[in-house]
């Protein structure tokens, strides 16, 4: 079992409640293969990987929001292009 000290991660995020929300969101992304891990997996579960990414400052709420916004913008562009092709 991997041992993870979350004190550094709490300091990066601000408080433990936001840490839980951020880590859960990131772990879900990893679990569903929506995003590749930013740290070596080392046979760890997605939750541990998420906490390590947060601890190293690679992931936070703002970064995930920006990534999600970019993905949504790409989807919207694709949909608009498809609609334009249909209406021509």
UniProtKB/Swiss-Prot annotation:
Gene3D superfamilies: 3.90.940.10. Its EC number is 2.7.7.6. One of its GO terms (molecular function) is DNA-directed RNA polymerase activity. The keyword NAD does not apply. The keyword Nucleotidyltransferase applies. It is an enzyme of class 2 (transferase). Promotes RNA polymerase assembly. Latches the N- and C-terminal regions of the beta' subunit thereby facilitating its interaction with the beta and alpha subunits. This is DNA-directed RNA polymerase subunit omega. It comes from Haemophilus influenzae (strain ATCC 51907 / DSM 11121 / KW20 / Rd).
């Amino acid at each position: 079992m991997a041992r993870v000290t979350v004190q550094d991660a709490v300091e990066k995020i601000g408080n433990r409640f936001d840490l839980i929300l951020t880590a859960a969101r990131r772990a879900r992304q990893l679990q569903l293969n929506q995003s590749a891990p930013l740290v070596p997996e080392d046979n760890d579960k997605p939750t541990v990987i998420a906490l390590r990414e947060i601890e190293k400052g690679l992931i936070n709420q703002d970064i995930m929001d920006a990534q999600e916004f970019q993905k949504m913008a790409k989807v919207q562009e694709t949909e608009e292009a498809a609609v334009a092709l249909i209406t021509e």
